[in-house]
């Protein structure tokens, strides 16, 4: 109805955004925000529903009154016609019965459509309820992350396949690390492990000396951000997407993040600027601009660990140059790990980790790995040939 229609549409949008962007919600620990938004919309829906029921009751009463008036008018007119000799008593009784038979089906038709709408809403509600194991969010230690990551014999399996197969790694806090290796070597799995979305099947992963199993997930994720080449957003304006992560950020910090992420330049090219509406996939923005928005959103969270999974693959050359010009500011006070196939980018990092079949086969600086790690040298040589260097 006109009373409940808009609010029900808002409920559906909220549910759809929560389902489609569930990993984004988990990544930024936005569960309380989404829960609050849902409760506010549900409260409005209840109030609107009560108003709708009152309106429906009024319509029902009016319909009943009109039906009774119609019966009285029909009988009164019939009596006059009978007295005038134009109609028999049997005819008036027949007309009254026929009118009753006509009114009932018409009323039933309207009732059917009302019931059909209620049934559809119920099915929608049931259909959008997802069942799955709940995560251990608030339980665990509240820890201020510094950014140290240690993996000891970590194994992560998908079915019977080991994506990480005895990973041993030690990354100091506030280090800039490039993670390289052939496809299927475990780069993305490692980053998602660092994000807190995966758990080791065997072995131990420590954050600043604490086993990640004993940390509060929502507390840890709120200090860790992963950005990949296909980010997911909420159907809203660019500004609303950014502020959802950090509603109380100051205007100075907000503008600074727009500048260092490169989003300021992107916004200048958009007719509606920061008020541009985007859908969950970031359309109508180009793929590179979507990643820029995702980078700005990630920096809004002020993460202590920043994870980039092939995030620069859709950047053009000028955007890549701008990114690395601002990289010192982006990486300030953070541990940064970037998985990449573009070996030319590794020179910007303090350490390089080389993965193959889920294990570390090399770790160090570019010059050292060229001498000590055959796989790294092979990857570097192939990249140089492709680039014509």
Give the ranges of each region predicted by the language model:
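Loop segments that connect adjacent transmembrane helices in multi-pass transporters
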Residues: 4-51
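Helix-to-loop junction immediately C-terminal to a conserved catalytic motif
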Residues: 195
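ABC ATPase nucleotide-binding domain helical subdomain, centered on the C-loop/LSGGQ "ABC signature"
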Residues: 206, 221, 239-280, 324-325, ...
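Cytosolic ends of transmembrane helices, especially the final helix of ABC transmembrane type-1 domains
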Residues: 7, 11, 30, 54, ...
């Amino acid at each position: 109805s006109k009373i409940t229609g808009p609010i029900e549409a808002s409920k559906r949008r909220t549910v759809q955004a929560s389902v489609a962007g569930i990993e984004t919600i988990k990544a930024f620990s936005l569960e309380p925000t989404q829960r609050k938004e849902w409760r506010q919309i549900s409260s409005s829906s209840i109030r609107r529903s009560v108003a709708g029921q009152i309106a429906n009751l009024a319509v029902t009463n009016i319909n009943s009154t009109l039906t009774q008036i119609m019966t009285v008018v029909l009988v009164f007119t019939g009596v006059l016609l009978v007295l005038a000799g134009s109609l028999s008593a049997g005819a008036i009784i027949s007309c009254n019965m026929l009118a009753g038979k006509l009114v009932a089906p018409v009323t039933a038709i309207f009732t059917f459509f009302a019931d059909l709408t209620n049934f559809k809403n119920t099915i929608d509600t049931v259909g959008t309820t997802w069942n799955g194991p709940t995560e251990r969010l608030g339980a665990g230690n509240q820890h201020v992350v510094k950014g140290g990551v240690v993996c000891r014999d970590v194994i992560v399996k998908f079915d019977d396949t080991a994506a990480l197969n005895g990973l041993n790694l030690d990354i100091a806090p506030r280090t800039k690390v490039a993670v390289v290796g052939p496809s299927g070597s475990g780069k993305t799995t490692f980053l998602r492990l660092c994000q807190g979305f995966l758990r080791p099947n065997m072995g131990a992963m420590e954050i600043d000396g604490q086993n990640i199993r004993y940390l509060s997930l929502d507390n840890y994720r709120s200090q860790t951000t992963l950005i990949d080449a296909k980010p997911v957003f909420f159907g809203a304006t660019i500004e609303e997407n950014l502020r959802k992560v950090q509603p109380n950020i100051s205007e100075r910090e907000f503008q600074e993040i727009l500048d260092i992420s490169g989003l300021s330049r992107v916004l200048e090219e958009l007719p509606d600027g920061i008020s541009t509406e985007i859908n969950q996939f970031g359309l109508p923005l180009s793929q590179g601009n979507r990643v820029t928005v995702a980078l700005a959103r990630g920096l809004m969270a002020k993460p202590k660990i920043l994870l980039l999974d092939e995030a620069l693959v859709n950047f053009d050359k000028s955007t890549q140059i701008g990114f690395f010009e601002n990289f010192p500011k982006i990486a300030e006070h953070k541990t940064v790990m970037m998985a990449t196939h573009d070996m030319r980018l590794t020179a910007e990092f303090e350490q390089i980790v080389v993965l193959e079949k889920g294990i570390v086969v090399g770790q160090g600086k570019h010059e050292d790995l060229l001498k000590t790690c055959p796989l790294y040298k092979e990857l570097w040589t192939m990249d140089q040939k492709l680039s014509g260097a």
